[in-house]
């Protein structure tokens, strides 16, 4: 989906990819056992770990008939490719299988055993036993202050949560991955809408009365994935930590700059994230497309256009409950600065085709709490991406192409804390009237394609 400046417009649609009900699990086992695909082999006698070839289509020795055969077979199996009718698209085939593997709780990638920098690269996955799946975890919190008076049942997919009282907003972190918050089936199957209306999707909570007689209430408007659970079994709200409740909001506020001139500002809403790039959009991807505009005629136009020519596949950004992630797909070098950057005085590079965490939800909440209760500095939440030039660079501050990215809810919490200073305790209210409602009412097309 294309997003124009100001975040206006859009369309709603959905696709029907599904690897639920163990379909992908059994399909892959059958393919490995068939021996039809070179390099797709079991790694152990128990047949619980397997190797899958993962050659990039840009390699000189890439053979589409052989290297893309498995990905094509998955597309055929899912009805996403019709031989003789549809145009062959190996990168999309590969992406569909990758996303299906990542979203399924039947598989776990063994990153330390994968080899992606050799002539015949491959990934290694483990088949997760039924009893060890993340979706089957029963999570509990023993802190009585975090117990809720009324349990509720989370129904799929992505329901509106009823009003609840949350007695302690800044809950301690849990040892959970962001995948614990996503449904077992891949997102494209879900007729999902990121917040379209305010009232029904509000998560309301009320904190205890404070010593000064004040009481803070808050309402979150967020994309709230359900916990995996047995049908008909109520789920205690206390199993969701604060970051899961608050940062299931998938929206990102993005500003694009040429030199120091703002050329586009918008808010994304796709739960799969967005792609910042230039030129044509990728029809196979339903990520929110954030396109750098063609530069106006000025002294730096040629230099800017030269850098933009290398942004064709762009960089993908997405917000998970535990933080903001990025994956650089384009040829252009991308450098970044933000709260998780290792260096403040020298460049931090986004490596190509590698996932990088740019913002940590729990760290932000903890630092915000430290500001509220102990008077410490407000936490950072803005991430800056610099395209084609090293950054940060104290010797040369002005850059040709940059993007400023902010998780929307972090931005709102930050400004509320700043405005209320020491009176900030456990929550905030979203304003009832928002200046640009189009940013929050955008219909979306939804997909898991990131590559």
From Swiss-Prot:
- State the post-translational modifications: Phosphorylation by ROCK2 regulates IL-17 and IL-21 production.
Citing just one GO molecular function, the answer is: transcription coactivator activity
Q: Which example biological process does GO assign this protein?
A: T-helper 17 cell lineage commitment
Please give the annotated consequence of changing residue 98 to W. Answer: In IMD131; likely pathogenic; loss of DNA-binding transcription activator activity
Subcellular location, record wording = Nucleus; Cytoplasm
Look up the domain of life of the source: Eukaryota
What turns on this gene? Answer: Not induced by interferons.
One Gene Ontology CC term in the entry = nucleoplasm
Assigned keywords, A-Z: Activator, Chromosomal rearrangement, Cytoplasm, Disease variant, DNA-binding, Nucleus, Phosphoprotein, Transcription, Transcription regulation
Q: What is its main location?
A: nucleus
Phenotype for residue 368 to P: Loss of DNA-binding transcription activator activity
Q: Does the keyword Amino-acid biosynthesis apply?
A: no
Tissues expressing the protein: Lymphoid cells.
Outline what the protein does.
Transcriptional activator. Binds to the interferon-stimulated response element (ISRE) of the MHC class I promoter. Binds the immunoglobulin lambda light chain enhancer, together with PU.1. Probably plays a role in ISRE-targeted signal transduction mechanisms specific to lymphoid cells. Involved in CD8(+) dendritic cell differentiation by forming a complex with the BATF-JUNB heterodimer in immune cells, leading to recognition of AICE sequence (5'-TGAnTCA/GAAA-3'), an immune-specific regulatory element, followed by cooperative binding of BATF and IRF4 and activation of genes.
The family line of this record is:
Belongs to the IRF family.
State the associated disorder: Multiple myeloma: A malignant tumor of plasma cells usually arising in the bone marrow and characterized by diffuse involvement of the skeletal system, hyperglobulinemia, Bence-Jones proteinuria and anemia. Complications of multiple myeloma are bone pain, hypercalcemia, renal failure and spinal cord compression. The aberrant antibodies that are produced lead to impaired humoral immunity and patients have a high prevalence of infection. Amyloidosis may develop in some patients.
Which protein is depicted? Interferon regulatory factor 4
